[in-house]
Amino acid sequence: MVAYLEFEKPIAELQARIAELRSTADAGSLDLESEASKLEAKSDKLLRDTYAKLTPWQKTQVARHPERPHFKDYVAGFITDFMPLAGDRAFADDQAIIGGLGRLGDRKVMVIGHEKGDDTASRIRHNFGMAKPEGYRKAIRLMELADRFGLPVVSLVDTSGAFPGIQAEERGQAEAIARSTEACLALGVPMVAAVVGEGGSGGAIAVAAANSVLMFEHAVYSVISPEGCASILWRTGDKAAEAAEAMKVTAADLQKLGVVDRVVAEPVGGAHRDPAAAIAALGAAIGEELDKLAGKKPTALRAARRDKFLAIG
């Protein structure tokens, strides 16, 4: 059963009424089944209408939905022969960032991304997708490996931001983020990044400075969370909705600003309502972007990437 968000309360109420009618209709009442069908049509229309005009803050809530597909779901959906590669060869293996070798269609790729986890135990293990320095250093190692063997890099971004703990700072969090961003820009192979949920600050761009940046329709991408922005500007997190509006966090706004190259449509009601369709759409979009970049020389790829990010702002 779908977990409904706060703004979806009218839809949830309709669905509860439909379930109630259908459980009663099991006794054989055709009139009740007919009424349930009418309510189902009304619910579907309400869902479409609601998602056609989401505010930036509502999109932020959708991007954070616990049932949205995560890195492991995407890998299982469109990467075959996946072979995970662990560790930064310096300190530890950070499970907030996962990466490895695999195939996207007939193309060999290096795939890297944030994993948030899907239950309490896995969320703790993956630190809710908030990477530490060793996570970004693992990403650097895998990108350098891909460059050495001529493999395109695919990055899936879904993080509220890099982990801000004191131990992470002591181990050089800022330096690791900067080096990872630099590693993206220095690649001589094609790189495609996709923001699939939250794209939070440097923790996101550290693995997203790519030739082509994709973004799901209801994903968000920003320098700070709306709550964080509100607490700084208004001294209260209650202004998060206003902050989300002001920061232009949505895919449509960011495409207009040139930060995002392509917006990938989601199923009606968000990726969490039809994960298989969302995963298939993203896999196809990434494949198309890699096709466009195939055959380009390393110098051209680096120059295009550099020019793209220098032009932002």
From Swiss-Prot:
Molecular function GO labels: acetyl-CoA carboxylase activity; ATP binding; carboxyl- or carbamoyltransferase activity
Complex and partners: Acetyl-CoA carboxylase is a heterohexamer composed of biotin carboxyl carrier protein (AccB), biotin carboxylase (AccC) and two subunits each of ACCase subunit alpha (AccA) and ACCase subunit beta (AccD).
Chief location category: cytoplasm
Source organism per UniProt: Rhizorhabdus wittichii (strain DSM 6014 / CCUG 31198 / JCM 15750 / NBRC 105917 / EY 4224 / RW1) (Sphingomonas wittichii)
Cell compartments where the protein resides: Cytoplasm
InterPro entries: Acetyl_CoA_COase_a_su, ClpP/crotonase-like_dom_sf, COA_CT_C
Gene that this sequence comes from: accA
Annotated ranges, domain CoA carboxyltransferase C-terminal: 42-292
Top-level division of the source organism's lineage: Bacteria
Family recorded in the similarity comment: Belongs to the AccA family.
Biological function: Component of the acetyl coenzyme A carboxylase (ACC) complex. First, biotin carboxylase catalyzes the carboxylation of biotin on its carrier protein (BCCP) and then the CO(2) group is transferred by the carboxyltransferase to acetyl-CoA to form malonyl-CoA.
Catalytic reactions of this protein: N(6)-carboxybiotinyl-L-lysyl-[protein] + acetyl-CoA = N(6)-biotinyl-L-lysyl-[protein] + malonyl-CoA
Biological process according to GO: fatty acid biosynthetic process; malonyl-CoA biosynthetic process
Protein name: Acetyl-coenzyme A carboxylase carboxyl transferase subunit alpha
Metabolic or biological pathway, per its Swiss-Prot or TrEMBL entry: Lipid metabolism; malonyl-CoA biosynthesis; malonyl-CoA from acetyl-CoA: step 1/1
UniProt-listed Enzyme Commission number(s): 2.1.3.15
GO CC annotation: acetyl-CoA carboxylase complex
Annotated keywords: ATP-binding, Cytoplasm, Fatty acid biosynthesis, Fatty acid metabolism, Lipid biosynthesis, Lipid metabolism, Nucleotide-binding, Transferase
